[in-house]
């Protein structure tokens, strides 16, 4: 896992060059927006159970076969595993948002996840739909202007959306 600063240093070192002005400017912009980033991560983390529960309710309403007898989320044990997996993915999205880098999510959460779900017979499209529903819920919370740092959060919301998109694509 590399945070944005470590990544810039590693790239400059690999080139055998000093850190460029444009790289410094990009990092400075990231620092100036850090309060918005912290607010967003805090909002997702503080509302994680609501985000997961809301997404699960919507998913099971859209795909009732998942909770019907024989479905992948039928029985309380399977339902708990489904909710746990959704929560884990959401947690790694927050790690990526916090660091501004998806590598920790890729390495520790998504790497091999599709193959695991295939081996278990879990429909990847349903998992991806659940991730997209979490994305919608999380972005709605992030974009709620009440009680957050002033300023435009469109770029940060877009960035966080890409982390959800990566997670959904990795299991679909």
Swiss-Prot record:
It is found in: Cellular thylakoid membrane. Contains two covalently linked bilin chromophores. (2R,3E)-phycoerythrobilin binds at residue 153. One of its GO terms (cellular component) is plasma membrane-derived thylakoid membrane. It comes from the Bacteria. (2R,3E)-phycocyanobilin binds at residue 82. Its main location: membrane. Keywords: Antenna complex, Bile pigment, Chromophore, Electron transport, Membrane, Methylation, Photosynthesis, Phycobilisome, Thylakoid, Transport. InterPro entries: Globin-like_sf (IPR009050), Phycobilisome_asu/bsu (IPR012128), Phycobilisome_asu/bsu_sf (IPR038719), Phycocyanin_b (IPR006247). One of its GO terms (biological process) is photosynthesis. The modification N4-methylasparagine is found at residue 72. SUPFAM superfamilies: Globin-like (SSF46458). Pfam families: Phycobilisome. It is a peripheral membrane protein. Light-harvesting photosynthetic bile pigment-protein from the phycobiliprotein complex. Heterodimer of an alpha and a beta chain. NCBIfam families: phycocy_beta (TIGR01339). Belongs to the phycobiliprotein family. This is R-phycocyanin-2 beta chain.
């Amino acid at each position: 896992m590399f945070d944005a600063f470590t990544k810039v240093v590693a790239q400059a070192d690999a080139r055998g060059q000093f850190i460029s002005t444009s790289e410094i400017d990009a990092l400075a912009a990231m620092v100036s927006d850090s309060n918005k980033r912290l607010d967003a991560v805090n909002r997702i983390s503080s509302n994680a159970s609501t985000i997961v529960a809301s997404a699960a309710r919507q998913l099971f309403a859209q795909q009732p076969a998942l909770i019907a007898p024989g479905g992948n989320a039928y029985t309380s044990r399977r339902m708990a595993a489904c909710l746990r997996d959704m929560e884990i993915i959401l947690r790694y999205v927050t790690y990526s948002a916090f660091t501004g880098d998806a590598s920790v999510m890729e390495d520790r959460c998504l790497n091999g996840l599709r193959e695991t779900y295939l081996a278990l017979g879990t429909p990847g499209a349903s998992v991806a739909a659940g991730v997209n529903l979490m994305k919608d819920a999380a972005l709605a919370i992030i974009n709620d202007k009440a009680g957050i740092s002033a300023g435009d959060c469109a770029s940060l919301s877009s960035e966080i959306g890409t982390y959800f998109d990566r997670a959904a694509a990795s299991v679909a």
